[in-house]
């Protein structure tokens, strides 16, 4: 049996269909909605950067949120045009918490630190 190519080994090793669940809660602790996030690929990052049409990390991360956040049934939670409303209407702290979860980062690491990686 011939050796598998490295790319084939890598693709077989990581399941992109596994999603992580994030519950958004209001100040009273009630769940407002639940977001599901698949693993982020480099292609996802490039697409979000192209949509944002900038190198600004905050713009890109909000576009990424709109692009990959899913409902339980797999449909999209947001349209690309929702990015501006998220930035204007949602408290920064809440948006940061969602985006840190989306990027699979701990709350100890800031978005700016994550964007340098």
Residue locations for each model-derived region?
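Low-complexity intrinsically disordered segments
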Residues: 1-15
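A short, compositionally biased
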Residues: 12-21, 63-64
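Short, surface-exposed, charged amphipathic helix/loop patches that serve as local interaction elements
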Residues: 28-117
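Short secondary-structure capping micro-motifs at structural edges
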Residues: 7-10, 20-22, 48-54
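Short acidic-hydrophobic surface loop/beta-edge motif
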Residues: 18-30
